[in-house]
Amino acid sequence: PVLQVVRDIHGDILTPDSRYIL
């Protein structure tokens, strides 16, 4: 499946799984 990749305010690449691991 294709994961939606977004960037937080620091420019870090976040995925649905990693966005909770800050």
Swiss-Prot record:
GO molecular function terms noted in the UniProt entry: cysteine-type endopeptidase inhibitor activity
Alphabetical keyword list: Protease inhibitor, Thiol protease inhibitor, Vacuole
Q: Where in the cell is it found?
A: Vacuole
Distribution of this protein across tissues and organs: Tubers.
Any one cellular-component term (Gene Ontology): vacuole
Family membership noted in the UniProt record: Belongs to the protease inhibitor I3 (leguminous Kunitz-type inhibitor) family.
Q: What does this protein do?
A: Inhibitor of papain (cysteine protease). Does not inhibit trypsin, chymotrypsin nor elastase (serine proteases). May protect the plant by inhibiting proteases of invading organisms.
Q: What else is known?
A: Does not accumulate in tubers infected with Phytophthora infestans. Has a single chain structure.
Record protein name field: Cysteine protease inhibitor 4
